[in-house]
Regions:
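Residues forming the flavin
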Residues: 1-595
Length: 595
């Protein structure tokens, strides 16, 4: 659940529930954003007649310091017990106004925002219609706040340890950042070794740095840090708890010498339990198997390989040799978007890094085989990022040929491969004879990572990548509190972007671990046990595992530490037992009555 806001209650009247609520309304002009469309003075006069309203004022910018002072002074002067501020979206300034109310002695959750900017003045051109609509929105908010109850955010202690799932480059970077800040980190990797795909690369663009040399420094550091608990050959089995306090069950796969047998048929390895406060998902990606592209000879023609296989051919210092017969290929054709941007045979998205690593591989091949011919068949060359366009131009200057057109078929012809393509710039069909074909296969989510994400009820997009809470404002957070994203588990990206995202995720983790306790928003689901019949609809609907059915009593139970307050359970409940604090059914009915 989202962390609560730190309010200084001061003399806040937590039990400000007098029989006759005293409601104050403050209407903001927001410059001309609201005042230029809505007749604010008219609205102020009309809202004074609403039940329970004892004060109504307008001000140019209520969010300013003078505006907040007016709110505080009016609360004290009129003895207000509830406040409605008619202004912009509550996302922007709800916390601002609630803090002002708390400072004046009102429970902050007795303050509500009526959005008359985004939902009224910005979308309604007619002044009379906008004025009537603004009044209706305020009237509904008054009906809601009249039924509100004083709430207090509860504090939850924080376990000052972190878990990183996946020990590729993203996971290693995140673990190092967290550990170097002074917190113990559990780094879990399902493979026997760490390093991920980067460990399999010959070099990286745009400077041709040796990938292994670059990675070795990270590996030595992470293996040498006492604050990093590295668990290879292990996988996360179960995660329970909530942000600040997760209990993680990890199974370590059994290791046997070749030819040995397990001690028992069900020997699944040793299980351990770790307590952590935050979790970084760095489960990475895989390349789509070449066997899925039968039209390209994938899985049928031995000299049709993917880019990672070609990296291994480039890894040594010797001559490049093709898999089928060990001969030096005199012509290598690189096929771009093999499975990417192809809804029929692969995935609809661009894999983002293929254009750059194909240019790198083509240049490395030309340097190893000076008399060789490197041809890149592409749909579009995409070169985002610093130095990328210059890198592509360097490839053309070093003799790499680019042919714009979609490859339609690849098949074996004698001891060579025949590539059918097109040159859309020249407007003709192209037939290329190649000794070796390298497919830039689509980057797809790691299947094990997808399975784990589904088990943890983390959100996935249509392609199976983990989904961020907001693509612009919360790019490394998930909708489940305490889980953060790093690397290609969230989508295709290069090494630079992966490292940056890993450090961003670790910074979010440190923001949690640096607190002694987390405040939980009290606006959560609640259940009326007298009405609940234990049908379980709420449990099935909850995306955060916050609602369960007590097996003995057959009643719904809400874990307030997990609840995000989304209200899905209240919608799904057929008996009406599930509700939401300060957004009860009674509040909703009375809000509707105001229209």
């Amino acid at each position: 659940m989202a962390a609560g806001t730190q309010f200084d209650f001061g003399n806040a009247r937590l039990a400000s529930m007098s029989k006759q609520p005293r409601i104050g309304i403050f209407v903001c002009h927001c410059g001309i954003n609201i005042g230029g469309v809505v007749k604010v003075p008219e609205v102020v006069e009309r809202v004074r007649a609403l039940p329970g309203v004892v004060a109504a004022r307008d001000y140019q910018y209520c969010c300013s310091d003078p505006g907040q002072n007016i709110i505080r002074e009016t609360i004290e002067k009129e003895g207000l017990s509830r406040v409605v501020v008619a202004c912009c979206s509550p996302t922007l300034h709800e916390k601002t106004f609630r803090k002002a109310c708390a400072a004046a002695g009102i429970n902050p959750y007795m303050c509500e925002v009526a959005n008359i900017r985004e939902q009224c003045s910005w979308v309604t051109k007619d002044r009379d219609q906008a004025t009537d609509k603004a009044f209706d929105i305020i009237a509904m908010t008054v009906a809601r706040v009249a039924n509100s109850e004083p709430l207090v955010a509860a504090g939850v202690p924080v376990t000052k340890r972190a878990l990183v799932i996946g020990a590729g480059l993203a996971g290693i970077q995140a673990a190092l950042d967290i550990a170097n800040a002074g917190y113990e980190t559990v780094l879990v990797e399902k493979e026997p070794s760490i390093g991920g795909h980067v460990a399999r690369l010959a070099s990286v663009f745009p400077n041709f740095d040796k990938a292994q040399e670059m990675l070795d420094a990270k590996l030595r550091e992470v293996c040498g840090l006492r604050r990093v608990k590295l668990l290879t050959g292990s996988e996360v089995v179960e995660v329970s708890g909530q942000i600040g306090n997760f209990k993680v069950r990890i199974r370590r796969k059994p290791t046997q010498a070749q030819g040995s047998v397990p001690d028992s048929p069900d020997d699944g390895g040793q299980e351990t339990e770790e307590l952590v406060g935050a979790i970084v998902m760095a489960t990475g990606h895989e390349l789509m198997p070449v066997s899925r592209l039968r039209q390209y000879g994938g899985g049928q023609v031995p000299d049709v390989i993917d880019a990672l296989q070609f990296e291994r051919l480039l890894a040594g210092n010797g001559t490049v040799r093709r898999p089928s017969d060990g001969r030096v290929p005199k012509r290598v054709v690189f096929v771009q978007c093999a499975g990417s941007r192809d809804k029929e045979h692969g995935v609809p998205y661009c894999s983002k890094v293929c254009c750059m690593y194909a240019a790198k591989q083509a240049m490395l091949y030309k340097r190893r085989v000076p008399d060789g011919d490197a041809v890149v068949c592409y749909i579009d060359v995409r070169t985002p990022g610093k130095g990328s366009e210059e890198f592509y131009r360097q490839a053309t200057q070093e003799g790499v040929r680019y042919v714009r057109g979609k490859v339609s078929k690849i098949f074996r012809s004698g001891d060579r491969c025949t590539v059918w393509s097109a040159d859309t710039l020249a407007g003709c069909k192209v037939v290329l004879e190649a000794d070796l074909v390298v497919l830039a296969m689509a980057m797809v989510p790691n299947p094990a990572g997808v399975s784990l994400a589904r088990q943890l009820k983390l959100q996935l997009d249509a392609n199976g990548f983990l989904t961020e809470a907001h693509p612009k404002l919360r790019p490394v957070e998930t909708l489940t509190g305490g889980f953060f994203l790093a690397g290609t588990c969230q989508g295709p990206k290069d090494i630079l972007e992966t490292t940056v995202q890993a450090s961003a995720a670790s910074a979010k983790v440190l923001a949690i671990l640096g607190q002694d306790e987390l405040l939980r928003e009290p606006t959560v689901a609640c259940v009326d046990e007298d009405v609940c019949v234990g049908c379980g609809n709420c449990e099935l609907t909850c995306a955060y595992s916050a609602v369960t059915i007590d097996p003995q009593r057959r009643k719904a139970v809400v874990n307030v530490a997990l609840c995000e307050g989304c209200g899905a359970c209240a919608v799904a409940c057929p008996s009406g037992a599930m509700s939401h604090k300060n957004f009860s059914k009674r509040s909703v009915y009375e809000m509707v009555d105001q229209i």
